[in-house]
C-alpha cells in the first residue's frame, strides 16, 4: 500500500491529521518484500494437480495458481461467500493462498470450530488496526479465544482505555470492514521481522525468543496493519459483518506483574447481525450469572490483594464447599476409594524424581529451609507414589484407589488470575488408581459410572474425547500403548456415550480421556480428567508382586515376580473452586436444596414470635438443615423480600397461629403460587420432607 493510500485510509477512518511513522515504515518494507515474493511466485512450475474433497470427488487444478476460494466458487457462489478457511492435507490454509501440490481439501465456515477460530482471529487483526489508529499504540498479542478475541497493547503516557473509547474503536473497525481490506500473507526472515517491528519492543521480544536464528515466519496485512502472525485468515475484512467491543482490562506483558502494564481490549464478531443480537442476549444472561457477582451478592466468597489468587470463603460459601466434599466422600466410600492425607510441601528431590522440577518449577512456590530447597505441592501424584512404595504390594492389593483433598498451590501469573476459575490456592477431588494392565478397562468403566452419577446429579451433560499416543515423544513401548488405548476404546464403547478420537494428542506419559461438561448456557468446561501414566511408576520404580507364569516359575524357582503398576490419574470435579464457579453460574445462584447454603429462612412476624422461631431453628439445625433466622427491625414484607433475593429455598413464616399448632407457613422459592402466601405444615412433617428432599439431591425444589 502506498503512502498516499495509507493517508487515504487514515483520513477515511477518522480524518487523522497526524501520520503514524511506524505504519509507513512497515508498509514500505512490506511492499518491497512482497514484490520480491511475487517475482519468485511467477517462476514456480505450473503443473496439473488433484484436489480431493471430503466426499472423495477429485477436482483438477494447477499448482501455485488454483486457490481454495476458486474451488469453492466452482461449487457454488453461496459456498464461496460463506467459507472462512480451508483445511489442506489436515492443515489450516488461507482461502486465497495458491495450492502447491496435489492435496486433500476441506472448506470450513463459521459453524466449524476451525472456521470460527479463523474468523475471530481475523477480527482480532481488525481490532488491532482500530486500536493502533485510535491510540498510536504498540500492539502485543491478539489471539482468538473460546468467546471471541482480544488484543493487548502498550500505550504511551500510561493511558487507560475506558468504556468511552468503545465507540471510537468500533468506528475504525467498521470502516475497515466496509473497505474489504484483503488479508495478505508474506513470509519474512527473522532479520526482516526485527527491522519491520523495530519500533515495538513487545514484538522484538517475541521475534527474538520464538523464532530461531536463520528462520522465517509469516506476517499478515490488512489495510495499514501488518502483524506478526502464522494465520490463516479470511479473504478480506468484509467477511466480518457484525463487530463489537465487549470489555477491556489491564494485563501484564507475558502475564508477569514485573513487566509492563498493558491494555487489553476484547471483542466479538459474527457473519451476520442476527447472531450478534443473540450473542448480546446471551451475554446479558451470562452477566447475571457471573459467579463473582453472585458470590458477592450472596456473601459466599471474596478475594483480597493480601493473598492474590486465594479465596476467602465466608460461612455460607464454606457450606457449599463442605457439602461437595461430603458428597465426594460418600461416593468414595461406596466405590472403594480410600482417602489419604499427604504433606503440603516436599523437598525438591521429590519433584526432581517426578520430573516436575525440570518441567514445572516456574509454576511452583519454592523456598529454602535450613539450606534445603522445598516447594509447595501443585499436585498430589508424586506423594501418592511415595505412599504406594512405602511397603511391599501384591497383585492382591490392586486396584489401590487413593483419594486426596490436599491443598494445592500453583504460581499462576497475577494477570491470569480470574475469580474462582483461575486461582493459586485450591483443592481437587484428586485420586489415583494403581492397577495391573489387565484392570485398566474395568477401572476406566468405574470412572465413567462415577462421572455419570456426579454430573447427572448436577444436571450436566458431557462429552468424551480420547487422546492417543503422540507421534514422536512418548514414554514406554508401543505394545503397552496399544494395549492401553485398546482398553480405553473398549471402555468408551461400553459406556454408551458418544466419543471422539483426538489422535496423537495424548500426554507423553500415557493416553488420556478429556471430559467436557456443558452448563445451562451451553458453555463448555473441562473439569474431569482420566489419564493413564506409564512415567511416574517408572520414575519412582513402583512395583508389585505379580504371579509368575508356570514357565517363569520353573526357571526362577519362584512363583512371584515384580512388575510395574499402571497409574490412573482421575478427577471428577477437578478444582473445587472452579467447580463452585461453574455451578454458581449453572444454577444462576438458585442452588438445589441439597447443595444450597441457604436452605431455610425463618421469619418471625414480630418479636413475640422470637422464642418459637428459635425453637424451630434449633429443630432444623439438629436435623442438619442450613437455617437462618431474620430478627432484624425490617417489616415483614421486607424480610420476605430479602430472603427471596438471597435465594433461600424455603421461607418459614412463624407467628402466634403457627406456634399454637406447632407448624410453619412454608413459601417455596420456585413456586410462584406460594410466594405471597405459603401453606401451613407441621414442623415434624416439614423436617421429614426437607430431609427426604436433601437425600434425593433433586434439582426440583419441591416438598
Curated annotation (Swiss-Prot):
Keywords: Aminoacyl-tRNA synthetase, ATP-binding, Cytoplasm, Ligase, Nucleotide-binding, Protein biosynthesis. GO terms for molecular function: ATP binding; threonine-tRNA ligase activity. It catalyses: tRNA(Thr) + L-threonine + ATP = L-threonyl-tRNA(Thr) + AMP + diphosphate + H(+). Its EC number is 6.1.1.3. Its main location: cytoplasm. Residues 47-109 form the TGS domain. The keyword Metal-binding does not apply. GO terms for cellular component: cytosol; mitochondrion. It is found in: Cytoplasm. InterPro entries: aa-tRNA-synt_IIb (IPR002314), aa-tRNA-synth_II (IPR006195), aa-tRNA-synth_II/BPL/LPL (IPR045864), Anticodon-bd (IPR004154), Anticodon-bd_dom_sf (IPR036621), Beta-grasp_dom_sf (IPR012675), TGS (IPR004095), TGS-like (IPR012676). One of its GO terms (biological process) is cytoplasmic translation. Belongs to the class-II aminoacyl-tRNA synthetase family. NCBIfam families: thrS (TIGR00418). This is Threonine--tRNA ligase, cytoplasmic.
